[in-house]
Regions:
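Acidic, metal-coordinating catalytic segment for phosphate/diphosphate chemistry
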Residues: 310-404
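Short, hydrophobic beta-strand segments
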Residues: 107-113, 303-306, 357-361
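DNA-contacting surface of Y-family translesion DNA polymerases
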Residues: 7, 183, 191-336
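Gly/Gly-Pro- and Ser/Thr-rich, intrinsically disordered tail segments characteristic of DNA damage-repair
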Residues: 1-227, 237-240, 278, 364-404
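A glycine-rich phosphate-binding loop feature that marks nucleotide/adenosyl-phosphate handling sites
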Residues: 147-150, 230-231, 286-297, 336-347, ...
Length: 404
């Protein structure tokens, strides 16, 4: 028997939450911006009227204003968004114990074993959930209904806002295969460009490729994308309540060439810290400590860890702390073969605290600016893929220094 999977996507989530406090702006173009006072701030979200004007997530404010001069800009309130996300998740949990969050505004629900309790009609249940969220919270959803997670997500993207799309065994080829290959889960900008070089523009063309060819071209990701395009995704929906609490978030890499200068090492650390910080923000976690492991060409590992002054999920904080630890373990020009950066002593964002800096009263303002910057980076990557933007500290400062 096929599974029944929903993918629920809150429409224009940030903007929709803001409009609950500004109902008078509901019919005018509105965008939530990382820094509304700056022309170079980034659009984090927009409502439907702004979307109809051509405003796009992750573009700069001046670009959006050029398209839509009467665009109303509102500041972001991330704590409020997390509160509404929890309220929506509480509704989902009443329909199944298999609900998996995918970011702050998306969730998969496996209702295979509970559908009979709500009438047995999948589309009717999806519509009922949409109507309940709208009635109780004032927010709208798009819901995809399908027999696997990948197609359910394609369904929620297929028709917006406030809609339900069913992708079934009978119709999936006619709906899915004509779509651009970039619509498929985990096909980022680099993968789309690579596939395009081989004439693969649609999901159907991807499905027609030989699995062995894709594996040669893209490694394990090629095999995975082949399965996704052919309706073979079997990944389970993982219940939030059953998930093991995350105790650490880390990333490590072996470099193509040994690192011997501080500039090279800081660039490598920044790349790793970027990955760690991005995941922390996605999981709603803060790091209370940092650990660094340094490996030399003889495969000798040395590690050190320390408590951070205050919990953080910011790239800059993690990069600075990890670099300081590395310099305790390493003296240039001794070669470094590999590095690992791990965030430890994690806490949910609601439990994190910020320690006042008595010697630097501007520290809070700097953190707020950095939070806006990294939120903008998250928005750009969500829209254009993980490789769409690189944190500046990950670039070499001196010409001739190789990138890690």
């Amino acid at each position: 028997m096929d599974r029944v999977i929903f993918h629920c996507d809150l429409n224009c989530f940030y903007a929709s939450v803001e409009l609950l406090s500004h109902p008078e702006l509901r019919e005018v173009p509105v965008a939530v911006a990382g820094d509304p006072a700056s022309r170079h701030g980034i659009i984090l979200a927009k409502n439907e009227p702004a979307k109809q004007c051509g405003v796009k997530t992750a573009e700069t404010i001046w670009q959006a204003k050029k398209k839509c001069p009467n665009l109303v800009l509102l500041p972001a309130h991330h704590k409020l968004y997390r509160e509404y996300s929890k309220k929506v998740n509480a509704i989902y949990d009443e329909y199944t114990d298999l609900a998996e969050s995918f970011g702050i505004d998306e969730s998969w629900l496996d209702v295979t074993n509970t559908l009979h309790l709500f009438g047995g009609d999948a589309k009717a249940l999806a519509n009922a959930i949409r109507q309940r969220v709208k009635r109780e919270l004032g927010l709208t959803l798009s819901v995809g209904v399908s027999f696997n997670k990948v197609f359910a997500k394609l369904g929620s993207d297929y028709k917006k806002p406030d809609a339900t799309t069913v992708i079934s065994r009978e119709n999936w080829r006619s709906i899915v295969w004509p779509l651009p290959v970039g619509d498929l889960l985990y096909v980022g900008g680099a993968a789309q460009k690579l596939l395009g070089q081989y004439g693969v523009k649609t999901i159907g063309q991807l499905a027609a490729c030989k699995k062995e060819t894709l594996e040669t071209l893209m490694g394990k990701m090629g095999t995975q994308l082949y399965e996704y395009a052919n309706g073979l995704d079997s990944a389970p929906v993982r219940a939030r309540l059953d998930a093991e609490p995350v105790k650490s978030v880390g990333n490590g890499t072996t470099f193509p060439q040994n690192l011997t200068t501080r500039i090279q090492v800081r660039s490598g650390i920044a790349v790793l810290a970027d990955s760690v910080a991005t995941r922390l923000r996605r999981e709603g976690l803060y790091a209370g400590g940092i650990q660094v492991t340094v490996r030399d060409p003889a495969f000798h590992d040395r590690s050190r860890q320390k408590q951070l002054p205050a919990p953080t999920h910011l790239i800059l904080d993690l990069t600075n702390a990890a670099m300081a630890l590395t310099e305790e373990l390493w003296t240039p020009p001794a070669p470094i073969r590999a590095l690992t950066v791990t965030a430890i002593h994690l806490s949910p964002d609601g439990e994190a605290y910020e320690q006042a800096d008595l010697f630097d009263p501007t520290a809070g303002q700097r953190n707020a600016r950095q939070e806006k910057l990294e939120s903008a980076m998250d928005a750009i990557r969500k829209k254009y893929g993980g490789d769409a933007i690189v944190y500046g500290a990950a670039r070499p400062e001196k010409e001739g220094d190789p990138l890690p």
